[in-house]
């Protein structure tokens, strides 16, 4: 697994803009492996000094976010990452969580994150909400 993360570091470190490559690889890896392997891979890759690899790991965390411990890690740890690109992926991963459990069921978590003292945690929700306003649930329930 360490070798795989090192190969991701070599591959992703040259990417300066966007996140599509990281997102595509994370989705492929998620679909190709069991959740325990992906969980270990996500935590290992999040330790990387290469922010693009941390972005990849945050996409993986998004796919695993039904797990309360993963969701708490996103809220409490990933939100402290100093790289703004990782923060953008945090917003996408929060959206993924809401999509997985359903936007209506996600409302208590949305409220919880909006009350968080960390501005990046709140930002993850509000960035996503700009996109979510087009989702059927939010169109039907604008309040």
Report each predicted region and the residues it spans.
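Alpha-helical scaffold domains
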Residues: 1-143
């Amino acid at each position: 697994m360490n070798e795989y993360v090192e190969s991701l570091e070599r591959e992703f470190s040259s990417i300066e803009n966007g996140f599509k490559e990281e997102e595509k690889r994370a989705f492929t890896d998620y679909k190709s492996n069991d959740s325990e392997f992906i969980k270990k891979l996500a935590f290992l890759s999040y330790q990387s000094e290469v922010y693009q690899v941390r972005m990849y790991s945050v996409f993986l965390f998004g796919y695993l976010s039904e797990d309360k411990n993963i969701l708490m890690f996103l809220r409490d740890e990933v939100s402290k990452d100093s790289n703004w690109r990782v923060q953008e992926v945090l917003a996408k991963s929060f959206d993924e969580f809401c999509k997985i459990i359903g936007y209506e069921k996600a409302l208590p978590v949305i409220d919880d994150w909006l009350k968080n003292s960390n501005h990046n945690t709140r930002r993850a929700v509000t960035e996503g909400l700009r996109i979510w306003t087009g989702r059927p649930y939010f169109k039907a329930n604008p309040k």
